């Protein structure tokens, strides 16, 4: 069972798309990621970009923990359906879903906009494609 582990939506259950295309991040891993972020940078009031969002669990966790706004980017229709349900469950008004490939989103993303980025790309994504996206991503990050 995937759930929000901390913050205002703590304990709310999330749906995960059926099939093998989405690999939900475990509660333990999410807890470690956010504990590290919070200790080092803080999450309160930040803008977060979640690429390859899957179920949206990572971005929604950020929203629950106080992120100002979150953009979830996911191209798969079944994953987007799960994300929409999870957005309703969490109820954060400033979480948006961009139903497109990460590379497409990054091409038109605003410059100097995001404080934090979460990216959990599929295993089969080629290294060169990831490198190109990272270069494009740099432009969207605040210093």
Regions found by a protein language model. Give the residues of each.
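Class I S-adenosyl-L-methionine-dependent methyltransferase catalytic core
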Residues: 1-143
